[in-house]
Curated annotation (Swiss-Prot):
Residues 210-219 have a biased composition (Acidic residues). The keyword Phosphoprotein applies. Residues 1-24, 162-225 are annotated as: Disordered. The modification Phosphoserine is found at residues 159-160. Residues 200-209 have a biased composition (Basic and acidic residues). The keyword Disulfide bond does not apply. Keywords: Phosphoprotein. This is Spore-specific protein YSW1.
Amino acid sequence: MSSLADTVEGSEAKRGRFSNNALTSDTGILQKNSTLRNWFLKPTADLKNSCEDRVEDDVNDVYLNDKNSQKSVEERKLGRKVRSFFKQTNSNKDESVLEDEDDALVWKKTSNKCAKKENSHDIQKGSFTKKIRNSIFKSANDVKEFRNENNLLLPVELSSDDENESHFTDANSHVMQSKSPEKIPSKDQCLTKGAKNKGLKKEYEKSFEEYSDDSDDEFSPATPPENVLEGPYKFVFQTPNTFTSQPNITVENDFHKGGRHVIDYLNKKLATMNIDIDLTSGGKQNVSWEEELDQLSDHVIESITNHISKGRMHAQEKQDELEKLKLENLNLSTLKQENLQHKQEINSLKDNLESISKKNNDLILEMNKLKKKSTNNKTNEYISTDENENEEITKSNMGPGILELNVNETSKKLQQSTFKPSKYLPRETRNNENRLKHLEKRIFGLEKSLEKKKKQVRADSVRLDLNRYTIDQFLTLLKSLSEVLQFHNVYGNDLKENDDNIIKIETCCSALNMKNCFEDSSFRLQENSFKRQLGPLFANINFSLIDQLTMNFRFYERSANFQKETIGGLRMMLQDKDNYIKTLMQHLKKKESTKLIKDSKNGASTLTS
């Protein structure tokens, strides 16, 4: 947002401090100091419907002077314009020559034309202080209707860094409104007059467009407040009844905390988020409200980040716990499924056994019934055959109503019929017998399979887990097992059949003392016998490791035997040497004895001679 006040000193931070009394007194700072007047008055214009004829050229001159950094010339020109305006608004009838006649004439024309079109009750006479007083203490019925709100110029921007004074902002302030837009030259005419400074005009137009876009802020109302001066220029004085809250002036040591609304908003938001932060802690009187806001914002950001990081850590821990619980649940579910499967298998086997036993009982009953029926049928058949064959009945000694049978023949035939083979039996009996045989074979096979399963369960319960043992412990265990095997003479036999021996081996291994070492070479293990006999016991271990261990064991044994053999050879050598020495000594003794004998003989011969 561009304005004349920004070109005087270059920044808003360098503006002077003043109170409300300076605006309502004839001999105040605003009347005496030209720079304050220039800061206070900001006669900018809307290029469409406001005074542009002279003001825009002056603004362009100021922009040029600002680029050339001629601050003294700027202050002089602005001082002339402001003085001419105040002399005209104070209703002085002196029409003496001003310092800049052209500028004064422009302001007079605009003010007179605006005054003609006003109503009688809107015309205000008197000094500048009366206008201010009338604007502040105006009644509610005398509120003026602002028809041309779009013609409002840029707002006056007054700032005060004093802690106990009012703050003037752009949001609730309005400036000069032209009351004679009919005789103001058009935009094209203004642009032709200042053809030299086209670039500056474009920048100036952009600044107004930016302000028009920003004018829809929530703090800038559609209609200006009541405390607005009337005339060619309108001023706004912020009172405690306006938009923003003001500090208590009565308290001397109170200091204004500029971000109080922001702090309240943050307190509410943090309370909804269940975050406890003392935003009022750490406030110092010597620190400005901007620095205090920065400190508070940093404190809030740090606390929020810490809270978020803690929340993330808790969430991660919960996720890890949930994953662990999920894994445990999966393991439990798998175990439950396996248990259910085993139970179902056991129940199915039980059902099969019960059904088979029932079938056996039924078949036994049927067999008994069939046997009874077969005996009855046999007797009936035999009787029928006997009757057919014995048709020749003796009737010689037969009285009335008496039959005589040949008893001898019937008895012989009955004896022959009892020795009939099975092929002469009826089909039903033969089929039932075949069924019984088949069922008996099946029952026999099931009983064998059950016995095998029982043996396997016993063997599995007896097996050892060698993964628990170290290498040294395993070597000692091998030695102890070899001793046990030699003691029980299990070589050449399968350990599956010798359950008692397996149990004894397990007891010996459990009662094994690791300090015992068997150094005898007679307790060697052979690979083939080891694999053949101890395979079912050590089903969970790799035989390559056993081979390596046995090879190492054999190497140590061979080295020990070699040492023993070398020692034995040395002993033999020593013994041979001893024998050789003995033989030499004997030989020497013999030589000495022969010499003595010869000497004695020679001596005797000499004596005789």
